[in-house]
């Protein structure tokens, strides 16, 4: 279901969103936020977070920078494992206890590696 949701949002971005004026009050845009949520969260958590984000995206709210926040537990041994940094897609920036901001790695930085 997550893959279907991501493909549906990608279809919206590619074919429908370009026909409409840019009106999202947040960075990342609501559709990009939804894709990040579905890539890093469970389906229902991502759906709820996306739904709440779309409800906040109007003239009654200030807008601004609003990265997805996920809950994640890392194993301590994970830190010491050798990993391939070329496959890093997201940075998890600590926010609160086991909650992290999700920040997408720029494609330009991926190409340099």
UniProtKB/Swiss-Prot annotation:
GO CC annotations on file: plasma membrane
Membrane topology: Peripheral membrane protein
Transmembrane segments: none
Chief subcellular location: membrane
Compartments where found: Cell inner membrane
Keywords on record: Cell inner membrane, Cell membrane, Membrane
Disulfide bonds: none
Pfam hit, one: YidD
UniProt keyword Lipid biosynthesis present: no
Entries under InterPro entries matching the protein: Membr_insert_effic_factor_YidD (IPR002696)
Protein's job: Could be involved in insertion of integral membrane proteins into the membrane.
Family: Belongs to the UPF0161 family.
Record-given protein name: Putative membrane protein insertion efficiency factor
Taxonomic source organism: Campylobacter concisus (strain 13826)
